[in-house]
From Swiss-Prot:
Residues 457-551 form the Disintegrin domain. It comes from Homo sapiens. This is Disintegrin and metalloproteinase domain-containing protein 10. Pfam families: ADAM10_Cys-rich, Disintegrin, Reprolysin_2. A motif (Cysteine switch) lies at residues 171-178.
């Protein structure tokens, strides 16, 4: 009982540490909101954009309100992620696949914003980068199986992702012993003479080196071959959803690598050249190397490496498997010389007599029985590709500031290539350290000319103001404003402002059709629960950031409060309380299970509904209810639209028994008990050995042996002997000759 109280206090303290989170989605996502915009309308817009001829119709607009702010997304089909020769391969055919459901864009009028995702069946899924951080949008049924929900999608902020970054010995990456085995294996590759690039011969010395740098200046794109196994397809369900997940991962790492300066090598990008999708129909296909359900992470990487990937910069396999020790990914580490592996590596013979391509890696989206949030998977992908690019794990005080005793450095966190997974919310978590940059720069200088290709530059005429452009109103038959030169103009003029014009409406909502900045009093953004309306400042076309409303302003229909401009805090915090969960085990009425409940800090015994007499001085008897779809009754059910807690037991008793037996927490508790009571384990071990020795000693003298030199076995004392009843004496009969008996028997 004491242990139970301590556990409750610890859980309450953990809730207090993240007190602003009041609507958890699962054990990794502490707060979310539902989205219920019109999917039919968005689907129709997508169909129009897909076959659009006019410039205006090529854009897909999506407006919704969530987390105390307004999202006005303006997106266009993303063609930068797929090469001109892009193919999708299935078990029986190769397709020229339509990727028109993949979009990229921004929040209209918000400088520095960015969005990427897909539109499938009228629903947007992807991520949205804003000034206040990144939001992730996913289908609701991926987390909540109740189909009567009043919303179809969920949206959550990156700060609400609570990923336990100490899982596994290396927190998502294989341990040192695995990498050491891989390193030794990489050293055994047999180099073919024809594979040595001509420019590596130093016959012409510095002159050749200068020429190499010049010719490779635009070769900055790594082309990918990505396969997905049948388990990955089974989780996401459709071919479109699988391709959307791949594009989301590639876009995420593309953003990280493009913004990193690798010692003068800039704008490193990624492009998908080919995708192989193994569907559930390939689960028993003997030609599918990934068909077996129980494959270790090293073997899984080896199966990928046994294929020939000479046509690609890197080749990855995405899966939905729960690998041992919490491993989320594994990849071969590249090197500038001396060993095989990493980017641009060609298939060659190794010490085990097999030809392999070591420009490979693998990624899984499952960890300890649960699916990780997209952000965690994106960072894992960036980490493993970092290995391919030549970076080992960060080490030393310079490159592991998160381990520093200096609080200022520690606050910034560790970098991408840190040995253990990072929480993702620190300044350095999405950056490469100086150690990684030095290592990657050496590999890029040596190898990128072997397989990298030229990337597409910003496109004048796509309606988006990109780097090097002043404005972008489209081509001559599309451009409707008088402020910007269209894309049909000669170089030096196209996508530039016309003389004497201050701005173009393509730059943002604070520019008039007369090419002048709007006055300071004009509104460019509606106010939201937690932010005031946006007002033009009179000297830029972009809509300035809105001022946040005071902290603890009610938002989200008075169920939450504003914190620093975000609708993220619980209404309980407004009165110095903490949010708690009303559970039936505490004697709460069934009607209270879907109420917002509050308690005094660190005192779970005071947990009560906002409509209770206990908190009437704060809420005046007003009952605040949870949103439909919110977890209730201590995560044993979900609130329906009638504010009733519907219990969910989708797994059944057998699945619960399996989870109880194979739960990692069970074995962690056993391991902790063994460490704490090692002496008891030692005594039990000695007792077991003595018991076995005594058993063998006692029973060995009664055990018969075929060895004639050993004494005969002793009879067991007190053994009961069975008495046979007397048999009648029979007269002996004359036996037939053996030969006739055998022949007669054979004839029968």
């Amino acid at each position: 009982m004491v242990l139970l109280r301590v556990l409750i206090l610890l859980l309450s303290w953990a809730a207090g540490m993240g007190g602003q989170y009041g609507n958890p989605l699962n054990k990794y996502i502490r707060h979310y909101e539902g989205l219920s915009y019109n999917v039919d309308s968005l689907h129709q817009k997508h169909q129009r954009a897909k076959r659009a001829v006019s410039h205006e119709d090529q854009f897909l607009r999506l407006d919704f309100h969530a987390h105390g702010r307004h999202f006005n997304l303006r997106m266009k089909r993303d063609t930068s992620l797929f090469s001109d020769e892009f193919k999708v391969e299935t078990s029986n055919k190769v397709l020229d696949y339509d990727t028109s459901h993949i979009y990229t864009g921004h929040i209209y009028g918000e400088e520095g914003s960015f969005s990427h995702g897909s539109v499938i069946d009228g629903r947007f899924e992807g991520f949205i980068q804003t000034r206040g951080g990144t939001f992730y949008v996913e289908p609701a049924e991926r987390y909540i199986k109740d189909r009567t929900l009043p919303f179809h999608s969920v949206i959550y902020h990156e700060d609400d992702i609570n990923y336990p970054h100490k899982y596994g010995p290396q927190g998502g990456c294989a341990d040192h012993s695995v990498f050491e085995r891989m390193r030794k294996y990489q050293m055994t590759g047999v180099e073919e003479v024809t594979q040595i690039p001509q420019e590596e011969h130093a016959a012409n010395g510095p002159e050749l080196l200068r020429k190499k740098r010049t010719t490779s200046a635009e070769k900055n794109t790594c082309q990918l071959y990505i396969q997905t196994d049948h388990l990955f397809f089974k989780y996401y369900g459709t071919r479109e959803a699988v391709i959307a997940q791949i594009s989301s991962h590639v876009k995420a790492i593309d953003t990280i690598y493009q913004t990193t300066d690798f010692s003068g090598i800039r704008n490193i990008s990624f492009m998908v050249k080919r995708i192989r999708i193994n569907t559930t129909a390939d689960e028993k296909d003997p030609t599918n190397p990934f068909r077996f359900p129980n494959i270790g992470v090293e073997k899984f990487l080896e199966l990928n490496s046994e294929q020939n990937h000479d046509d690609y910069c890197l080749a990855y396999v995405f899966t939905d498997r729960d690998f041992d020790d919490g491993v989320l990914g594994l990849a071969w580490v590249g090197a500038p010389s001396g060993s095989s592996g990493g980017i641009c590596e060609k298939s060659k013979l190794y010490s085990d007599g097999k030809k392999k391509s070591l420009n490979t890696g693998i990624i899984t989206v499952q960890n300890y029985g649960s699916h990780v949030p997209p952000k965690v998977s994106h960072i894992t992908f960036a980490h493993e590709v970092g290995h391919n690019f030549g970076s080992p794990h960060d080490s030393g005080t310079e490159c592991t500031p998160g381990e520093s005793k200096n609080l200022g450095q520690k606050e910034n966190g560790n970098y991408i290539m840190y040995a253990r997974a990072t929480s993702g919310d620190k300044l350095n978590n999405n950056k490469f350290s100086l150690c990684s940059i030095r290592n990657i720069s050496q590999v890029l200088e040596k190898k990128r000319n072997n397989c990298f290709v030229e990337s597409g530059q910003p496109i004048c005429g796509n309606g988006m103001v990109e780097q090097g452009e002043e404005c972008d109103c489209g081509y001559s038959d599309q451009c409707k404003d008088e402020c910007c030169f269209d894309a049909n103009q000669p170089e030096g003029r196209k996508c530039k402002l016309k003389p004497g014009k201050q701005c173009s409406p393509s730059q943002g909502p604070c520019c008039t059709a007369q090419c002048a900045f709007k006055s300071k009093s004009e509104k460019c953004r509606d106010d939201s629960d937690c932010a005031r309306e946006g007002i033009c400042n009179g000297f830029t076309a972009l809509c300035p950031a809105s001022d946040p409303k005071p902290n603890f302003t009610d938002c989200n229909r008075h169920t939450q409060v504003c914190i620093n401009g975000q609708c993220a805090g619980s209404i309980c915090e407004k009165y110095g309380l903490e949010e708690c969960t009303c559970a039936s085990s505490d004697g709460k009425d069934d009607k209270e299970l879907c109420h917002v409940c509050c308690m005094k800090k660190m005192d779970p015994s005071t947990c009560a509904s906002t409509g209770s007499v206990q908190w009437s001085r704060h809420f005046s008897g007003r009952t605040i209810t949870l949103q439909p779809g919110s977890p209730c009754n201590d995560f044993r059910g979900y609130c329906d639209v009638f504010m009733r807690c519907r219990l969910v037991d989708a797994d059944g008793p057998l699945a619960r028994l399996k989870k109880a037996i194979f739960s990692p927490e069970l074995y962690e508790n056993i391991a902790e008990w063994i460490v704490a009571h090692w002496w008891a384990v030692l005594l039990m071990g000695i007792a077991l050995i003595m018991l076995m020795a005594g058993f063998i000693k006692i029973c060995s003298v009664h055990t018969p042996s075929s060895n004639p030199k050993l004494p005969p076995p002793k009879p067991l004392p007190g053994t009961l002997k069975r008495r046979r009843p007397p048999q009648p004496i029979q007269q002996p009969q004359r036996q037939r000759p053996r030969e006739s008996y055998q022949m007669g028997h054979m004839r029968r």
